[in-house]
Amino acid sequence: MNHVFTFLEQRLMPPLNKVANLRFIRAIMQAGVITVPFTIVGSIFLIINNLPQIIPPLASFFEQTILKFSPLYSVATTMSIGSIALFYCLATAYYLTDIYRKEEKLQLSSFVGAILGLFAFLMTIIQVDISDSGAQLLQTTGETAIIYNGVALGSWVTRFSGVGIFIGILTAVLATQVYRFCVKKKITIQMPAGVPDGVSKAFASLIPAIIIAFLMILINGCLAVFHTDLHGLLSKPFEFVKDLTGSWLGIIVIMLLIHLLWAVGVHGTAVIKNSFINPILLVALTENIDGATNIFAGDFVNMYIFIGGAGSTLGLVLLMLFRAKSQ
């Protein structure tokens, strides 16, 4: 056993500690924590919608009372879980900008960084196709969803939900890097000393915003030539990763890695779950709302693996409560 711990400490801890200390990883971890309240709020109203399945004997009662107002209160689910990519993008860009501001002593505004990240993400929402006749906004009609003026619509803007989380993170990091580069190299509009700080920061973001706009137009245009976009380009590899992590073998490997890190003094939950797994869980949860049956989604981990703490320590806690004695 000592050989195992020695191997983990010497071979596994150093690279994982380096990964955990990467600035964008730290920003994603913080973004994952800050978005938790929105998933909880959305889940509460989602449970209300499923009361007939939870308590079948009272199904007719719920249908005649609470569920009559479902279109009203379901807005809370749509605007929380259904918009989770927006929150992830804003939070990631905000915290990453804040990290650069503090660690590199740059004159950055975390709020401006968040807005630039959101701007970059929104530019990936519209679907455009380029042919011999030029560029056109996609228009399609399906049974469950449509694309109107380039925007995929279900009950809400589809790409604002879990399916857009990774693009939201990617564009947040990209926009923050552009903002940081412009400020670091002084490629900004400098205002006189007497101008209020808020106005000065607003004009300082103008050139980064222009660069981000041209950059996203270039990326969208290049991909539209091949009849795809960022979401379409990354959907296949991400779907493979989601399916892999959602398998029983994937779950076992992930949880084993988390607890091995705990065993050698590294916060395994923060390094593995909060940074990499939470976005995947949110995507799976969003799919479940639409009728999918992903097991590894939402609070599955907390209910069946982390109950009482990492390692399902509820039994140990109860044992300590009733059997432990003070020395």
Residue ranges and their predicted role:
Residues G265-N274, G309-T313:
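Transmembrane helix boundary and interhelical junction motifs in multipass membrane proteins
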Residues L256-A270, M320-L321:
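Transmembrane alpha-helix interface/packing and boundary motifs in multi-pass membrane proteins
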Residues Q107-F111, G268-K273, D299-N302, Q327:
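The feature identifies polytopic integral membrane transport proteins across all domains of life
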Residues N278-Q327:
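Helix-loop-helix junctions within the multi-pass membrane cores of secondary transporters/permeases
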Residues V112-A120, I272-L281:
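Central hydrophobic cores of alpha-helical transmembrane segments
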Residues I40-P56, N220-V225, L285:
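Juxtamembrane "helix exit" motif at the C-terminal ends of alpha-helical transmembrane segments
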Residues E9, M13, K18, F24, ...:
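Loop-helix junctions at membrane interfaces
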Residues M1-T39, A59-A263:
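Signature of multi-pass transmembrane helix bundles
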